[in-house]
């Protein structure tokens, strides 16, 4: 396992270590980070064993499954969400372990009273809180993590939003989390897990740090508990080195721990594309992305960003077996096969070797247990939001959270502009639409305009809910009137300033200067000036050669690489590059 020392997007914290004992060894961990990160960075990936003695490691990585439970200073804790701060000893839970019952203290039990209780401080929960607060409705948010933000904290990429006034569009996930949380964190109960819903609309909580039990009495309940990873079945699916995307992404982007440097990704959807891309940013090599369907999933612009890096996407392929290393503490290969309807075709098996991690990105399952029980306790006064109701993008979760806030207000009889509710509802529906292809090829200016001055090409061929590019152009040259249209450049207004290139969340805007044979490409990883490169199209096919002349640094950390092209027939085909020496 590897500690991430440098990152093109994340601001890494100053090193400040604490120490604890693990099986007779002294382990150093970064202050504020989890026990799981410290153990993995020290090379200890096995946290428990099955009843037959097989090694076990992290499974969900977000505190939902209990697979990583260990004894922390004598208490059972989930090490994926337990900080190293103040910890003295960590050890595996013995097979015959039976915790000692401890009488509850005689102190006063806290009972919070509010109008709306929100379970889950992720995108949906925080958006609901923000809107409820704006409407003047008292609320309390409960989350079992040490920081609010949920899945947004794990996301380093820019997000798609279609907005009348720019707020979240083009923002990175972790920045959206901070914005939604706001300056005041009053009414947010962190490190608290909901362990039951009781009669009389009472919610039972337990603080996972102090073990304090408390209650919330609320009139309305919003369940925004997110989702859990779906894990397909294959041989050796339980060995360390096989991790769900949630584990891989959280450890990488929040705990700054890279679980492997030679990655096989399973699942060609948005999660598969983005975790692979983010792993590359953190220093990993992606061997391939395999997909059981006969076509790619997710947004085409997300698939393009990994293809331009030379990462192969293999459709109609399934994972048959993970090949463990000698001591079953990791993987060294995988057996894949061609498939039809997800069934492997005999005789097509092949081995992908020289890997040290399998990144499982095969979807999510709503974590809706509290929503189901909430219906019997709160009746019609329970609401679901985000992935707890429908698996979708963070954009959808935010909009559904806001929609729920308006629905609560209606039930309470509060007056507000109904058009606001309709607008949020429309945006929520639009955010779930599948991208619809509208163009066969990107729009480009005529030959006279192309040779007169620099210009941009927007390689956005599908209509979907995103428009940060329209706010980026200082000349107002980019328009996108609806979620079902594509952005269009008015080349009479465009002056070729390239300010839009780094503001596309899908990295799908490229700049060209035919007079100088120069291309301007968005980059979000370390780039060395003077390097010779192969120029590639959106499929990763080589279409020319060039040299990186200059890297223009940008505040949003999507920089511009100015590349001098050579040996290229059509400059407009260039969408990326691959280093000649890798």
Q: What residue ranges belong to the model's regions?
A:
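Short, charged beta-turn/beta-strand-edge "cap" motif at the junction between a beta-strand
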Residues: 74-76, 96-97, 508, 537-542
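Short, solvent-exposed secondary-structure boundary/capping segments
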Residues: 90-91, 553-565
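Short, well-ordered loop/turn sites that connect or cap secondary structure elements
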Residues: 382, 526-528
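Acidic (E/D-rich), amphipathic helical modules within compact regulatory domains
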Residues: 455-459, 464, 468-507
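Extended Gly/Ser/Thr-rich low-complexity repeat segments
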Residues: 216, 531-537, 569-582
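Residues forming the flavin
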Residues: 1-23, 30-55, 59-455, 498, ...
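Short alpha-helix capping/helix-loop boundary micro-motifs
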Residues: 461, 517-523
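Short beta-strand-centered aromatic/proline hotspots
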Residues: 542-553
């Amino acid at each position: 396992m590897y500690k991430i020392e440098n990152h093109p997007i994340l601001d890494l914290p100053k090193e400040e270590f604490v120490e604890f004992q693990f099986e007779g060894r002294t382990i150093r961990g970064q202050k504020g980070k989890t026990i799981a990160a410290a153990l993995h960075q020290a090379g200890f990936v096995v946290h428990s064993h099955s009843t037959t003695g097989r090694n076990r490691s992290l499974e969900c990585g977000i505190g939902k499954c209990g697979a990583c439970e260990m004894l922390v200073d004598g208490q059972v804790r989930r090490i994926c969400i337990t900080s190293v701060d103040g910890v003295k000893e960590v050890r595996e839970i013995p097979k015959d372990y039976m915790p000692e019952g401890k009488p509850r203290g005689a102190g006063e039990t806290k009972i919070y009273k509010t109008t709306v209780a929100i379970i889950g401080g992720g995108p949906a929960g925080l958006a609901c809180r923000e809107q409820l607060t704006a409407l003047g409705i008292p609320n309390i948010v409960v989350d079992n993590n040490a920081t609010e933000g949920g899945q947004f904290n794990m996301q380093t990429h820019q997000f798609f939003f279609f907005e009348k006034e720019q707020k979240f569009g083009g923002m990175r996930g972790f920045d959206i989390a901070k914005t939604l949380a706001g300056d005041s964190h009053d009414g947010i109960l962190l490190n608290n897990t909901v362990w039951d819903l009781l009669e009389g609309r009472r919610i039972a909580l337990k603080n996972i740090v102090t073990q304090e039990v408390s209650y919330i009495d609320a009139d309305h309940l919003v369940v925004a508990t997110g989702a859990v990873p779906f894990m397909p079945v294959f041989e050796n699916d339980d060995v360390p080195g096989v991790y769900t995307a949630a584990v891989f992404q959280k450890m990488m982007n929040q705990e700054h721990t890279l679980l492997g440097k030679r990655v096989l990704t399973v699942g060609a959807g948005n999660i598969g594309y983005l975790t692979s891309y983010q792993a590359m940013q953190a220093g990993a090599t992606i061997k391939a992305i395999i997909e059981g369907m006969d076509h790619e999933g997710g947004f085409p612009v997300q698939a393009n960003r990994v293809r331009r890096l030379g990462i192969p996407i293999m459709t109609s392929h399934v994972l048959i077996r993970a090949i463990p290393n000698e001591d079953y503490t990791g993987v060294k290969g995988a057996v894949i096969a061609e498939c039809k309807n997800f069934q492997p075709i005999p005789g097509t098996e092949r081995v992908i070797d020289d890997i040290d991690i399998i990144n499982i990105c095969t979807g999510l399952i709503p974590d809706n247990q509290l929503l189901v029980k909430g219906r019997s306790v709160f009746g019609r006064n329970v609401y679901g939001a985000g992935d707890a109701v429908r698996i979708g993008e963070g954009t959808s979760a935010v909009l559904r959270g806001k929609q729920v806030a308006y629905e609560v207000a209606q039930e309470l009889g509060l007056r507000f502009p109904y058009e606001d509710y309709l607008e949020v509802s429309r945006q929520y529906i639009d955010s779930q639409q599948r991208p619809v292809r509208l163009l066969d090829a990107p729009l480009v200016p005529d030959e006279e305009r192309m040779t007169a001055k620099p210009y941009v090409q927007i390689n956005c061929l599908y209509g979907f809910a995103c428009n940060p590019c329209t706010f980026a152009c200082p000349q107002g040259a980019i328009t996108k009137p609806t979620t079902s249209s594509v952005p269009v450049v008015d080349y009479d207004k465009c002056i070729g300033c390239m300010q839009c290139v780094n503001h596309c969340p899908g990295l799908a805007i490229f700049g060209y200067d035919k007079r100088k044979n120069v291309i301007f490409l968005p980059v979000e990883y370390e780039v060395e000036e003077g390097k010779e490169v192969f120029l590639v199209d959106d499929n990763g096919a080589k279409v020319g050669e060039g040299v990186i002349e200059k890297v223009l640094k940008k505040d949003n950390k999507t920089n511009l690489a100015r590349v001098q092209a050579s040996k290229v027939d059509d400059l407009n085909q260039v969408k990326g590059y691959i280093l000649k020496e890798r």
